[in-house]
Amino acid sequence: AVEMPPKPTDRPLRLPIQDVYKISGIGTVPVGKVETGILERGKTVVFNPSQKAAGVKDIEMHHTSHAKAEPGDNVGFNVRGLAANDIRRGDVAGYGDNEPMFVRHDETFVGQVQLMDIPKAIGVGYTPVFHAHTAQVAVRFVELLENSKTKEANPAFLKTGDAALVRFQPTKPMAIEQMDAFPELSRFAIRDMGKTVAAGVCMKIDKK
C-alpha cells in the first residue's frame, strides 16, 4: 500500500480564505482549505494581511458541525464580531502566536522564478499579477538579482526560458510565506495577458 505522508497537523495553522459569506442568523463565514495546523472551535484566529482577529464560533464541513479541522479539510467557519467586508479572499488565517506572514506594499521579498512564456524581454518595473494560494495581487519587479541560468548578476532583462532571483514589491499587502517556513504557501504563479508566464517560490521576505 502507498503510505500517505503525515498530515502537517503539528505545524502552525495556515488557512487561505477562498470566499467570505454573510449568512443571515449566523453572521460572517469565511471559507477555505486548511493547509497546515489545526483549526479549533473556540480559538481566536488572525486574518492577514487584513490584520483582523476573531473567535471561531463553529466549524462546518459537509453541512455538519465539527470541533476542529485538519490539513486538507475544506471548511466554512463562523467568526464572532467581524463584518463580511472586514476580511476577504486572499487573507490567510492563523493564530496570534504565529501569525500568517504578509508583505506590505512598502516591503519586498526575494523569489526564485522560472520564466515560461514571457511575450518579450522584461526588466525592472514589470508589474504582472501574482497568484499565490487564493490571493491575486499585482507585483512589481524591483531588482533583477541574478540570472540563475547564466549566473549573471544584476542582468538588464530576462526572457522566456530564464530562471532568476528577483526582488519583488507587491502593489498592496499580500500574504505569502518563505519556502523554508511554509513551502505550501511560498509558491506563486505569474499571469499576464490572460496566461501563466512564470512560476516561482518566495525565498526571503524583508520586513520593515
Set out the residue ranges of the language-model regions.
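C-terminal effector modules of nucleic-acid-centric enzymes and ribosome-associated factors
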Residues: L82-K208
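Conserved catalytic-core segments of large NTP-driven translation/proteostasis enzymes
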Residues: A1-K120
